A protein has these predicted regions:
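Positively charged n-region of N-terminal signal peptides that target proteins for export
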Residues: 1-5
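Extracytosolic ligand-binding ectodomains
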Residues: 6-10, 21-390
Length: 390
């Protein structure tokens, strides 16, 4: 054997064994990620979907070979859709569980409460589902990083489309939450900028009876109705519209209606209902088709945008950790501030305050019992259908 061949074999032997030693040294080591999920309470459906997305990312990354040589472990607690409960749990994650990383809960109100805790400990928090711009107003510390389109911009594309179609009379109904308030304020601003008449602008409290509310709305004879609401209120709202035979040309909800539960509750009455969403299953969006296929195989239903958001948050956090090369809170914060990344969800890019500025919103419509992407035009062949209560 020549000296050259011997050196090559010896080097190969050293590389193989050193890699095995490195791998074996991480056996039993994990990176822990703490998060709450709304597994009960008013956000149960969306919160459950979101957690399924996060868990799917965890399974994928562990199958690929882990993160920084360690397996990823989720520590999950039910926050019962209550902001105060979530805030207490996140403090426990930091002080008692000593988690390495954090992902945010579901909803703007709960995230806002949690961010006050994570700010106190200078702990970076990637918000999975928080879009109310007021969360980022007057923040002194850039430790909260958004992934959603800001809610006050969510209705901009559909309102501009309605104005282009000469629809002028707009009604805006919204639930009493930080997220839906922001949607309503943004919708009113954009409508006024496009010379539309805001003929109805009224908040409602969560209720199973919208009859009196819808009666007042019906008197204004709107051509387009914008509704800022979560799933259960959205279902009851459509039922009340049908009962009073209110039939605008466009009926648009803020989200949470792209689920099988919405379709099951309303049957054919979902036809032509629009929803401004953060993500769509369109095959023209990178990774969307593969994710949808695998998610349905695993969960027996197609993913909602909340599920996609959960998965994408994992992708973004993974990218930031890999690029920083450590679990240092300071390094992670700096990386999340400067990161430009394209996830399953779209473009991630934040301003100096951590507010999302890189992502765009999509418009989905129920057509023939199926979810169809109808905007933006460059991503779909489907056209918007006018709404008609039957």
């Amino acid at each position: 054997m020549t000296p050259k061949i011997f050196i090559i074999l010896l080097t190969s032997f050293w590389l193989i064994n050193s890699s095995q030693l490195r791998a074996s040294s991480f056996i039993g080591e994990t990176i822990t990620i703490g998060l709450t999920a709304s597994l009960s309470g008013k956000f149960r459906e969306a919160g459950t979907q979101q957690l399924k997305g996060v868990k799917m990312w965890r399974d994928d990354i562990n199958e690929r070979g882990a993160l920084l040589g360690k397996r990823v472990k989720l520590i999950v607690q039910d926050d019962h859709s209550i902001a105060e409960d979530a805030a207490e749990i996140y403090e426990t994650f930091i002080l008692k569980d000593k988690v390495d990383l954090l992902l945010g809960p579901y909803s703007s109100d709960i995230t806002n409460a949690v961010a006050k805790v994570t700010d106190k400990f200078n702990f970076p928090l990637l918000a999975i589902a928080a879009s109310a711009s007021s969360i980022w107003d007057k923040r002194n510390k850039p430790y909260l990083f958004g992934t959603y389109v800001q809610s006050d911009q969510l209705m901009t594309p559909v309102i501009k489309l309605a104005a282009a179609k000469n629809l002028r009379r707009i009604a805006i109904a919204y639930a009493n939450t930080r997220y839906t308030n922001s949607i309503a304020q943004g919708a009113r601003r954009v409508a006024q900028e496009n010379n539309m008449d805001v003929i109805f602008y009224e908040m409602f409290n969560t209720t199973n009876d919208f009859r009196e509310y819808v009666e007042r709305l019906a008197e204004t004879k709107p051509e387009i109705i914008i509704v800022g609401a979560y799933l259960e209120d959205s279902i009851q709202f459509v039922k009340a519209l049908k009962q009073h035979k209110v039939s605008p040309k466009m009926l648009v909800f803020s989200g949470s209606i792209d689920t099988d539960e919405f379709r099951s509750a309303l049957g054919n009455d979902v036809e032509a209902v629009l929803s401004a969403v953060q993500w769509s299953q369109s095959q023209r969006l990178p990774g969307a088709y593969d994710f949808s296929f695998r998610y349905k195989q695993k969960n027996k239903v197609y993913p909602s945008y909340q599920a996609a958001g959960g998965y994408a948050a994992g992708q973004i956090l993974e990218a930031a950790v890999r690029l920083s090369g450590s679990l240092s809170k300071k390094d992670l914060q700096e990386q999340l501030l400067k990161l430009k990344f394209r996830s399953l969800f779209g473009h991630y890019r934040v301003d100096s305050n951590g507010q999302q500025i890189g992502k765009k919103a999509y418009l989905m419509q129920w057509q023939d019992g199926e979810r169809r992407l109808v905007m933006p035009k460059d991503l779909t062949n489907h056209t918007i259908r006018l709404f008609n209560i039957k």
